[in-house]
């Protein structure tokens, strides 16, 4: 019996080549996902199957010399989910975040995504997920703009500008009247 498990690794350039930055497709996918959530054809972590994941935290001060310090924005999270419908997939987003990463020339958050076979649990792909998460985040309000914006809407507002706000603003603008918005407004402590 062959017990080898093959899976692919998709780096950030591989993810771009696979279409992760196709925002229109991201919005379509998120709209399909919301329909499945509404129907209940999904599962997440937690006792009610709707938890946003499991996060590791650290005591302050750390009781052991090798234990990470409890610092602002230090997060280590596993975010598992099953999505049914035509997706029929199981995956886990690994979220590692530390504001001190910037001092090392790294992004604040470093994300990976493991896609697994629903029946066997075997890994299918391990993916760089910073762009995946950013474009998914931007696509969600794009769905809202698509479905809820008035036909004459020309202004989009973004609360909490930052890295994620760039994709939110870009997508909402494309969804309003099938074209770029004429005015953008932001509210938050950081420039986007």
Model-derived features: where do they sit?
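N-terminal ligand-binding/catalytic initiation module
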Residues: 1-133
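Glycine-rich adenosine-cofactor-binding loop
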Residues: 138-144, 148-192
